[in-house]
Amino acid sequence: EIRLSLVGSEMCIRDSDHTAEHVRAYIKVQDGCNQFCTYCIIPYARGRVRSRKIAHVMDEVHALAAKGYKEVVLTGIHLSSYGVDFPAEEKETLLSLIRAVHEVEGIERIRLGSLEPGIITEEFVQSIAALPKMCPHFHLSLQSGCDTTLERMNRRYRSAEYAEKCGLLRKYLGNPALTTDVIVGFPMETEED
């Protein structure tokens, strides 16, 4: 649900509804996007990046743990940009959020929603590999394996970089589950692409 009067404010991101019989809760920690991929309307429909403060997210995580939830999935329209909207003096990152959730008693598993390849750095992967509650499952947006198409899509990575990021995850996490999404038939894409 989007209320246009709230677009651009943290209030646009609502706490999720949860039911007692479930063990997995989805927590939306971020909304909006600043990427402006050529095929995507999200920056226009949802606005720019807005992140929930860690303290606010933690209130929800603690409440979920108290209700018996064992697993949380941190989600967002552009999860990798979590925190980029905060002023420098109030900087919070996705990694700092993950670490905070990891400390919550009762939460046994943490998953992440879809990530952009750019967030997968050696430091990021080493850090999450050191957190036993992190599930080794990552959805990395690919969209196309063709660099020309990626450029036309206004994606900010190329296929070799994407493969390198997958390699980093495998290096530090052994055999993680990797999933992706691919757009087929993008305008001007050829059979060779």
Label the model's feature ranges.
Residues 10, 14-22:
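His/Asp/Glu-rich metal-coordinating catalytic cores
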Residues 46-73:
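Conserved alpha-helical substructure of the radical SAM core
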Residues 19-23, 33-35, 134, 144, ...:
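Short flexible coil/turn linkers enriched for glycine and charged/polar residues
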Residues 20-55:
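Canonical Radical SAM [4Fe-4S] cluster-binding loop centered on the CxxxCxxC motif
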Residues 11, 33, 37-40, 57, ...:
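Hydrophobic packing within well-folded, soluble alpha/beta domains
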Residues 66-191:
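Conserved SAM/AdoMet-binding glycine-rich loop
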Residues 12, 26-28, 41, 73, ...:
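Conserved beta-strand segments that form the floor/walls of ligand-binding pockets within enzyme
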Residues 1-8, 12-13:
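Single conserved hydrophobic/aromatic residue that forms the stacking wall/gate
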